[in-house]
Amino acid sequence: MSSKNTIISQLEAEQMSKEIPEFAPGDTVTVSVKVVEGSRERLQAFEGVVIAKRNRGLNSSFTVRKVSYGVGVERTFQTHSRLVDSINVKRRGDVRKAKLYHLRDLSGKAARIKEKLD
C-alpha cells in the first residue's frame, strides 16, 4: 500500500484540476483573489514578487511580497484555493535561491531583481 490512501489521492487530484501557470521565486506575479464584502463578491489584484514557493500537492502555497506606500506587505496564498481566481506572470526574475527572505531587509534599488533573458 502506498504512503497515501488512494481515496484521498483521488479527492486531491479532483481539487487540483485548476490550470496554474509555471512560476518560480523571483517572478513578478499578479494574483486575483475573490473578496467577499457583505453580500457582494469582487476580485482584488495583488501584484508583487514571489519570495517563496512550497510544493506539496493540494497543500501547495506561495508567498508574494510588495511594497505599498513604503510599507512591505507579504501575503501567502494556497495555490489550489477557490479564493485564488487567477495567477498572471508579469515578469521572470533571475535568482539563485529558492527562498528570497533576504529581500525583507533590502529597500529601494537594492531590492531589485534582474530579469531573466531567455
From Swiss-Prot:
Residues annotated as transmembrane: none
Domain of life: Bacteria
GO BP field: translation
Family matches, as Pfam families: Ribosomal_L19
InterPro entries listed in its UniProt record: Ribosomal_bL19, Ribosomal_bL19_sf, Translation_prot_SH3-like_sf
Signal peptide range in chain numbering: none
Key word Ribonucleoprotein present: yes
GO molecular function, one term: structural constituent of ribosome
SUPFAM superfamilies attached to this UniProt entry: Translation proteins SH3-like domain (SSF50104)
GO cellular component: cytosolic large ribosomal subunit
UniProt KW keywords: Ribonucleoprotein, Ribosomal protein
UniProt cross-references to Gene3D superfamilies, sorted A to Z: 2.30.30.790
HAMAP family: Ribosomal_bL19
Function recorded in the entry: This protein is located at the 30S-50S ribosomal subunit interface and may play a role in the structure and function of the aminoacyl-tRNA binding site.
UniProt record similarity statement: Belongs to the bacterial ribosomal protein bL19 family.
Protein name as it appears in the record: Large ribosomal subunit protein bL19
Organism: Hahella chejuensis (strain KCTC 2396)
